[in-house]
């Protein structure tokens, strides 16, 4: 599993009982739902960035109705084909975790990280899907070391090619779905 980096100083974080800590003393609490907020105020462009709770719940209801199930299956098939040896996967812009959970089932040996700028989305994902590491953060400043992720999934989300390239391992896979 790759390190998760402190958004303040860039040092590796260590998971304590309910906190992520860095050697310089920066501390990030794990919420009771199971996610960590690594989005510093300096990286926010609004008071509540990302989707609202209402938007997230509406999307979850829509996705659970099965309308995008064929798309999810196709993405999982691509992940198994191109990322079958992946050890660490990031769903960048994971939303409420629908696609993250599908990828986790498709590649069960890989460590899954879900990241979204919406605290409401990450809260919902972490509350429902316990198998991943859920992070409130931004794709513009990924909290991972260079060359540490084997597969990045971006489903209808903000893409930052330079940042994705930085964190991908050599030969790593980037799967993107656009509307």
Locate each region found by the language model.
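Class I SAM-dependent methyltransferase Rossmann-like catalytic core
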Residues: 45, 50-71
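Conserved SAM-binding loop of SAM-dependent methyltransferases across substrates and taxa
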Residues: 96-108
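A short glycine-rich, Lys/Arg-flanked "PGG" loop and its adjoining helix->strand segment in the class I
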Residues: 161-173
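Conserved SAM/SAH-binding beta-strand->alpha-helix loop
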Residues: 116-120
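Conserved class I S-adenosyl-L-methionine
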Residues: 85-95
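Conserved SAM-binding strand-loop segment of SAM-dependent methyltransferases
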Residues: 130-142
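A short acidic, Gly/Pro-enriched loop at the edge of an enzyme's catalytic core
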Residues: 140-151
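N-terminal auxiliary segments of SAM/dcSAM-dependent transferases
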Residues: 1-48
């Amino acid at each position: 599993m790759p390190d998760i980096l402190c958004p303040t100083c860039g040092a590796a974080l260590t998971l304590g009982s309910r906190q992520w800590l860095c050697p310089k003393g920066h501390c990030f609490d794990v919420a009771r739902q199971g996610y960590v907020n690594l989005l510093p105020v300096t990286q926010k462009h609004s008071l509540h960035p990302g989707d609202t709770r209402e938007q997230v719940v509406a999307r979850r209801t829509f996705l659970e109705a099965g309308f995008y199930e064929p798309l999810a299956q196709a993405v999982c098939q691509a992940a198994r084909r191109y990322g079958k040896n992946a050890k660490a996967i990031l769903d960048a812009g994971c939303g409420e975790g629908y696609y993250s959970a599908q990828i986790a089932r498709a590649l069960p040996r890989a460590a899954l990280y879900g990241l979204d700028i919406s605290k409401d989305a990450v809260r919902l994902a972490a509350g429902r899907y316990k198998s991943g590491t859920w992070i409130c953060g931004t794709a513009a400043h990924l909290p991972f070391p260079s060359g540490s992720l084997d597969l990045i999934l971006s489903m209808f989300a903000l893409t930052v090619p330079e940042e994705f390239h930085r964190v991908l391992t050599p030969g790593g896979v980037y799967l993107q779905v656009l509307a």
